[in-house]
Regions:
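Flexible, low-complexity junctional segments that flank or bridge functional domains
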Residues: 20-210, 214-223, 279, 287, ...
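Charge-patterned, long linear interaction tracts outside catalytic cores
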Residues: 326-336
Length: 337
């Protein structure tokens, strides 16, 4: 079974469970929309136990705290603000409430983290004669180290693209894959890229699916495997560069790569976002999106809230002033050892 099929199997289960559940009907009133949102999260959000352990989240207490703020005559804008504040209690940057006029989101997960990326400085490394293979930009640095920048996994990464890219970089003594500021995209593209860095089937993580409405109703962890590509594969050291804006499918890419031989993760903690998403709609048409099926790395550690690098590095002001990227320079040193 391919890793893609194995990874997406729980989505079907989640959908089946949702379709078989009794659907509660709520009035399209401030109170009805509040009740609908609180219950949707209560029955489907998958990190309550983790959050309770981390900082003592009590979702029942949150209900009573915010119910007092709901009034029959409150405006749509006022209701949106209260519901957004209630979702903030989850402290989860991957929980969003969508309305026609705005999107409620929790941005504090970025706080305390430097940008650790500069497009202006990146030009210094890519130059003007770098090559482009669909979603990849690549070049060879002066010290004979290959460099690939992957700005997004929304752009197709085909097998032919990877053949050409890796063939051109085959003379290099090592490779840097930069996924900083990559907000994700199509997981299959991330898997296609990762499959070029292992010679065998590798366990890369686990996933659980919802089995009921209680906060702890999850299946036993099911393994996720990455199948090795049957085409040109890389056999030399690799450094993957990350920052807090590496999330969603990129977070999964980092999770996979850290399980592979010869790979070192360098930079800052990723932004997370590996849990399988679930969407639902409120009576007034607003929609909410959050993680409903938790995923873990190969050591059964949560990856939803970010993956720590093997070597933590921050860009320094001194290097910035000299047009240097501290994280890239560190990766070059690691490969050059």
């Amino acid at each position: 079974m391919s890793v893609r099929k194995l990874f997406h199997f729980p989505i079907v289960l989640c959908a089946m469970l949702a379709s078989c559940s009794k659907i509660e009907v709520y009035d399209n009133t401030p109170k009805g929309n509040f009740e609908a949102l609180w219950n949707i999260i209560d029955e489907r959000y998958c990190f309550f136990d983790y959050k309770a352990e981390e900082y003592g989240l009590d979702w029942d207490a949150v209900y009573h705290q915010y119910k007092r703020k709901i009034a029959d005559d409150m405006s749509s804008t006022g209701l949106f603000e209260v519901l957004g504040d209630m979702l903030d209690e989850l402290r989860d940057g991957h929980v969003n409430l969508y309305a026609a006029h705005d999107v409620a989101r929790y941005w504090n997960f970025h706080e305390g983290y430097a940008a650790n990326f500069s497009e202006e400085i990146l030009v210094h490394y890519l130059g003007t004669d770098y090559k482009i293979a669909s979603g990849l930009r690549y070049t060879i640095l002066p010290d004979n180290i290959g460099y690939i920048y992957v700005p997004s996994f929304s752009n197709s990464i085909g097998e032919g693209n990877l053949d050409e890219c890796l063939h051109a970089l085959a003379i290099c003594r090592g490779l840097i894959i930069d996924v900083r500021d990559n907000g994700g995209g199509n997981l299959s593209y991330a898997e296609t890229l990762a499959a070029r860095f292992t010679n065998e089937r590798v366990l890369t993580g686990y996933i659980c699916h919802t089995t009921g409405k209680e906060h702890s109703d999850f299946s036993s962890p099911e393994p996720i495997y990455l199948e090795s590509s049957d085409r040109l594969r890389w056999q030399k050291p690799v450094c993957v560069l990350t920052n807090r804006s590496s999330y969603s499918a990129t977070n999964d890419f980092v999770k996979i790569m850290r399980s592979l031989p010869l790979v070192t993760i360098v930079g800052d903690r990723t932004g997370g976002g590996s849990g399988l998403p679930f969407s639902s709609e409120l009576p007034n048409g607003w929609s909410v999106r959050f993680s409903a099926c938790p995923s873990f790395d190969a050591d059964m550690r949560h990856t939803e809230f970010g993956i720590a690098p093997d070597i933590h590095v921050e860009m320094t002001d001194e290097d910035r002033s000299r047009g240097l990227d501290t994280i890239i320079e560190t990766a070059r040193q690691i490969i050059g050892q």
